[in-house]
């Protein structure tokens, strides 16, 4: 007898499909931004190459370190609450990456267009506001790394697990490929401003994922 809340196509639960769908959105959001993060830091915020590489490297390292702690916390509060926390933080972080340049431009430190014109931003400490914004993204992303694959494991049986993980990794790859391909056509149309607006795309993806979890994710395993 199946004790899952609702079995979907081919023996998978609704929670399984929701987990995989939000993973698709999260990967699209992540790769759309991460692939140009170093360029964003240098071309939009005025960091030199060393500073931009250092910040980007610390961000990447944190994404692999923090799941040790966030994964343990996720076990205590359950997958659904963890995903809500994760996508809330990711939405705040991505939108923060988009809003920050607007605030810097309003302060007269930079002018954005097809190319970026700095008016003192490289010498201003204000640009370092990016660090807490990236930290929010890092924490949100660390939850995702630990909970989505675990949710897939919980929502499959021995008979469906191999097929379930095949679907999961397909979603990861499709999301990564799609996210990486968005920036070039956007940059061809609006120039360096693309590095700003891509963050709103990623924010929209994580907001959709957040709503999907809130409205659709129900599981007896968490």
Predicted regions and their residues:
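Short amphipathic helix-loop junctions that connect adjacent transmembrane helices
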Residues: 35-51, 188
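A gly/Pro-rich, aromatic-decorated transmembrane alpha-helix motif that marks the paired
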Residues: 69, 99, 174-189
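C-terminal ends and interior cores of transmembrane alpha-helices
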Residues: 88-125
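Loop-to-transmembrane helix entry/capping segments in MFS-fold secondary transporters
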Residues: 49-50, 158-168
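Intracellular loop-helix junctions on the cytosolic face of multi-pass helical membrane proteins
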Residues: 1-14, 158-162, 183-222
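Intracellular juxtamembrane helix-capping segments at the cytosolic ends
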Residues: 143-157
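Central cavity-lining transmembrane alpha-helices of secondary-active solute carriers
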Residues: 57-72
